[in-house]
Swiss-Prot record:
InterPro entries referenced in this protein's UniProt entry, alphabetically: TatA/B/E (IPR003369), TatA/E (IPR006312)
Protein name as annotated: Sec-independent protein translocase protein TatA
Organism, scientific name: Mycolicibacterium gilvum (strain PYR-GCK) (Mycobacterium gilvum (strain PYR-GCK))
Gene Ontology cellular component terms for the protein in this record: TAT protein transport complex
GO molecular function, one term: protein transmembrane transporter activity
Length: 84
C-alpha cells in the first residue's frame, strides 16, 4: 500500500515528459551523470588527500627511561673524592 506501483511510475514519467519535453530529458540526464562523476572524483580526491596528510605526520617518539636502583649504586667511590 505504501509503495509506488508501476502505474504510479508511468504517471510520474508522463508528467516529466509533458513539463520538460522529450528533448530536454536526455540533456538533463546527461548533465546529472556528469555532475555525479565530478562529485565522486572530488570525494575520492579528498579522501586521498586526507590519507596523505595522515602519512606525512611524523610518528611521535616516546623517550625511554632508565630506572636506576639506588641500592645497587655505591654511595662513595674514589673518583668522586677531591684531593684536599
Amino acid at each position: 500500500m505504501g509503495g509506488l506501483q508501476p502505474w504510479h511510475w508511468l504517471i510520474v514519467i508522463a508528467v516529466f515528459v509533458l513539463l520538460f519535453g522529450a528533448k530536454k530529458l536526455p540533456d538533463a540526464a546527461r548533465s546529472l551523470g556528469k555532475s555525479m562523476r565530478i562529485f565522486k572524483s572530488e570525494i575520492k580526491e579528498m579522501q586521498s588527500d586526507s590519507n596523505a596528510a595522515k602519512s606525512d605526520q611524523p610518528e611521535q617518539i616516546t623517550s625511554e627511561r632508565v630506572v636506576v636502583d639506588p641500592s645497587t649504586q655505591s654511595t662513595s667511590s674514589n673518583s668522586d673524592k677531591r684531593p684536599a
